[in-house]
């Protein structure tokens, strides 16, 4: 038995494992990948980007005349193109760090390209390549979610907006995918380091106070925050793990909880798979002989938020 000097018989508590300090936020390595662009409009936009985009569009005030719009991190063009249909005299400047994404956007723009639609490949972080007070409306659908420094990006969006112009952004809030994280937390029982990393990861998702703090720091006025949750349905664990939305998105962060412990990661994800499958097959069975037992989907909640504000006059 180990003892503390001067205190015979007192046992020394075993040091608890400590998680390494959080690493600086890293950009999604798939963000500029052509494989992501190839499936974005078919597999990701309908269930992810479009619900956020509709929320954004609902908060944009009407524009009259030859307004100049800016869409930052425009992906494949929407909802910026929707704004153009609302504003027949406006022109749209849209930027995104992904060349393959912009190639899709160019095809969708059709004859409007270089007439009312102007697309540019730009990193977007940490500074936008535009003069101050240049745009009548500035939007970013999920741009803050994809930014490694969202508070700085919001400041840039404010800087390039004209005095009095509206700035409208969307992003998911803390609590998104809560059902999955609850299951994962259970599977991490006894893995203290991974549990600490998971806690840090969950805290990295912004809450309402965080977003309001970003808006205040950016100097925005008339701040309104609308929260409109929606749900995603997955047929089971395999459908979840291999859904492009997950595979090219948060799966990277989930794997990073295990650092280089590939064996531990595999064990946890296999156990998690089995637990999800168990949940999906626990639907009430119909009377014998009528039809096979029904499965129920895995439901994940997305806490979608839209920040609408204006640059002060």
Question: Where are the language model's segments positioned?
Answer:
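Conserved class I S-adenosyl-L-methionine
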Residues: 3-64, 78-82, 86, 101-104, ...
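C-terminal helical/coil "lid" or tail adjacent to the Rossmann-like core of SAM-dependent
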Residues: 35, 39, 224-294
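A short glycine-rich, Lys/Arg-flanked "PGG" loop and its adjoining helix->strand segment in the class I
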Residues: 151-166
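A short acidic, Gly/Pro-enriched loop at the edge of an enzyme's catalytic core
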Residues: 127-138
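A short SAM/SAH-binding and catalytic strip from SAM-dependent methyltransferases
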Residues: 136-150, 171
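Core SAM-dependent methyltransferase catalytic element
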Residues: 242-244, 302-313
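Class I SAM-dependent methyltransferase SAM/SAH-binding core
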Residues: 68-127, 152
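Conserved catalytic/acceptor-binding region of the Class I
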Residues: 164-236, 248-254, 303
